[in-house]
Amino acid sequence: MTNLHRLGATNLHIAPLVLGGNVFGWNLDRAASFAVLDAFVAGGGTMIDTADVYSAWAPGNKGGESETLIGEWLRASGKRDQVQIATKVGMLEGPNGEKLAPAHIAASAEASLKRLGIERIDLYFAHQDDDSVPQEDVLAAFGKLIDAGKVGALGASKFHAARLKSANDAARAHGLPHYHVLQPEYNLISRHSFEGQLQDYCVEHNIGVVPFFGLANGFLTGKYRSAADFGKSATRGTRMAPYLEGKGPTVLAALDKVATETGATLAQISLAWLAAQPGVTAPIASATSPAQVEELLGSMALTLTPDQLTALDVAGA
């Protein structure tokens, strides 16, 4: 049975790996999405992360496709009580460019609830910061959703340390709900935007961290080791070039060494390293097949030694 971890100061207890929902309705059709979701729950996973904007970037899409497929799966599987649903507002803008305007938050939440076919969003994220709206107004809008029973807990995504602190300071001053979860970009390659002030703030204030891009767009799987490998993925291959520059090859070499020592895959090791970092409750990773889900879930049982963690730290520094 999977050991669940409390997510910051929320009442959510989650498995130490979160399933990313950005592939549903983009890389994956309905049947493939259902297969991945079934495998995730069967393997002990609990939290599914999506957003209203997923996957507006795909030709013919307008946003909401991922939520719609997850909602269809929830109805077909009857597994609503086995999972926690996290979604986001703020990237799929309103008709006048609204991001976190109170009316847009309210309307977006209703649309997400309808697509998901649920009565409450377990964890609702501000998908990005919006300095055009006073932070207390944003939090008051979220507070109304919590009071109405439509949202369980709040999170912030892509916030800098100063803005996360000022938001929670405003919450304290005005008696409003806090951001108890942070979703930053963080992995062995991309570390400096989280490590330091932001990580320290999260640890000090018990803010649960669920990093996205935990596998650096797939680079940390070891699948892309040269430009010749870029063709292995039509959607991700073109994003690999920056990772091959600088410390990328050094990180892969360090992962290879740990893989030899443990028998684990590079993806499992990368996620286990992430899960071991201060403040991190569970990394987020997406999968395109049940086999990938099984591999990723294997990271939950992998404990790296202090020497292995140090070697990876040094390689990715």
Describe each PLM feature range.
Residues 113-132:
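Active-site groove signature of glycoside hydrolases
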Residues 1-81:
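N-terminal binding-site loop/beta-alpha segment at the start of enzyme catalytic domains
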Residues 129, 133-317:
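Beta/alpha (TIM)-barrel catalytic core signal, keyed to glycine-rich beta->alpha loops juxtaposed to Asp/Glu
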Residues 29-40, 100-115, 164-168:
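Short, acidic/polar
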Residues 54-59, 92-97, 295:
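A short acidic, helix-capping loop that chelates divalent metal ions and anchors anionic groups
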Residues 41-42, 73-84, 113-117, 146, ...:
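Acidic (Asp/Glu)-rich catalytic clusters
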Residues 8-25, 84-96, 120, 125:
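N-terminal small/glycine-rich loop or linker at the start of catalytic domains
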